A protein has these predicted regions:
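Extracellular loop and loop/strand-boundary signature of outer-membrane beta-barrel proteins
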Residues: 1, 38-47, 84-90, 96-100, ...
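Strand-connecting loop/turn motifs
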Residues: 17-19, 64-68, 106-110, 122, ...
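Outer-membrane beta-barrel translocator domains and adjoining extracellular loop/strand segments
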Residues: 34-43, 82-89, 120, 125-132, ...
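C-terminal beta-signal and adjacent terminal beta-strands/loops
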Residues: 198-205, 223-273
Length: 273
C-alpha cells in the first residue's frame, strides 16, 4: 500500500522603482516524523501518518546606495501540526510567530556594519490542547517544601497545568534579541571586528518558575592575512558577562540551567602551500 504526502510553496514579490521589494510567501510541507530514538512506528506506516508544517510570511526588503545598503523586514507565522511521534516531550506541535529585521551597510572599502532584531514567540499547541505538560519538578515548583534537601537524591515528576496560551509558551527562547556588528579592514592585511548581542530574560522551565536573566554579550577580534598565511585572535565574551541557557526546558528546565563560557580566547593560524 502506498501513501502520498504533498509539499508546496508559493511566493509573490514586486520590485518598486525606488528599490523596495514587498513579498508574500506561503508553504506547506509533509514530513514523516521519527520518534525519540529515530524509529518509525508501525502505526505511522499503516496509517500513513504525516506531519504537516505550515508557513506564512510577508515582508519588505530592498537594496540602496548602489547596493551597498541592504535591509529586510519579515513577519511570519509557522505551525507544525497533525502528528506527534513521542508524546509531547520531543515532537510536540508548535506554533511560532515573530518578526525579523536585518540591516547591512558597506559604508566604504574599509568599514562594514550590520544590525539585526528578532522577536519570536513559540507555543506548545499539544500542551494547550491536552491541558498539561509532563516534566521534572524543581524546588521552585514545590512552594510548600521549605527544606530543599528533602529532594536530594531523587526527582519529583508530574504535569504542569496549562490554563491559557501564555502558559504554553516554550521556555528558553528570549522574546527579543538585538544584534550589532562591525568590521574594519585597514587594507594592509589587518582587519578588526566587533559584535554585540543583547537578549531578553526568559523562563528556563515550562512551569515558568525559573527565570534566566537578560544578558549583553560582546565579542571582538583581529585578523591578519599575508600572501601565504593568515592569523586571527578572537576574544569571546569580552566583558566576562555571567549568563545562562536552558537545558531541555520542556522536561528539565526547573532542575538544570547551563552556565555559558566566561571570557575566553580563540587563536587560529593557517599556512597555504
Amino acid at each position: 500500500e502506498t501513501f502520498d504526502g504533498v509539499s508546496w510553496n508559493a511566493s509573490v514579490s514586486f520590485k518598486t522603482e525606488i528599490g523596495f521589494i514587498p513579498y508574500i510567501t506561503a508553504a506547506e510541507q509533509a514530513t514523516l516524523v521519527a520518534g525519540q530514538g529515530a524509529e518509525i512506528g508501525v502505526g505511522q506506516v499503516s496509517d500513513g501518518a504525516f506531519d504537516t508544517s505550515d508557513l506564512f510570511e510577508y515582508g519588505i526588503k530592498g537594496s540602496f546606495l548602489d547596493d551597498s545598503l541592504y535591509f529586510a523586514l519579515s513577519i511570519y507565522e509557522q505551525e507544525r501540526t497533525d502528528f506527534s511521534a513521542q508524546a509531547i516531550v520531543t515532537n510536540s506541535t508548535t506554533e511560532n510567530n515573530g518578526t525579523e529585521f536585518e540591516l547591512r551597510w558597506v559604508i566604504n572599502d574599509n568599514l562594514v556594519v550590520g544590525a539585526g532584531y528578532t522577536n519570536i514567540k513559540v507555543y506548545n499547541v499539544t500542551a494547550m490542547e491536552e491541558g498539561n505538560q509532563f516534566g521534572f519538578f524543581g524546588i521552585e515548583d514545590l512552594s510548600s517544601v521549605t527544606d530543599a534537601s528533602l529532594l536530594y537524591g531523587g526527582a519529583v515528576i508530574g504535569f504542569n497545568l496549562v490554563d491559557d496560551k501564555e502558559s504554553a509558551r516554550k521556555a528558553g527562547i528570549p522574546e527579543n534579541i538585538y544584534t550589532l556588528n562591525a568590521t574594519y579592514d585597514f587594507q594592509n592585511g589587518y582587519a578588526v571586528n566587533a559584535s554585540l548581542v543583547k537578549a531578553d530574560e526568559t523562563f528556563s522551565s515550562f512551569s515558568q518558575v525559573v527565570t534566566l536573566p537578560s544578558y549583553t554579550l560582546i565579542n571582538a577580534g583581529i585578523f591578519y592575512e599575508a600572501d601565504s598565511w593568515t592569523a586571527s585572535l578572537n576574544i569571546k565574551n569580552l566583558t566576562d558577562e555571567r549568563y545562562f541557557r536552558a537545558n531541555f526546558p520542556d522536561l528539565f528546565g526547573s532542575q538544570i540551567v547551563l552556565p555559558e563560557l566566561p571570557r575566553h580566547y580563540q587563536a587560529k593560524f593557517s599556512y597555504k602551500f
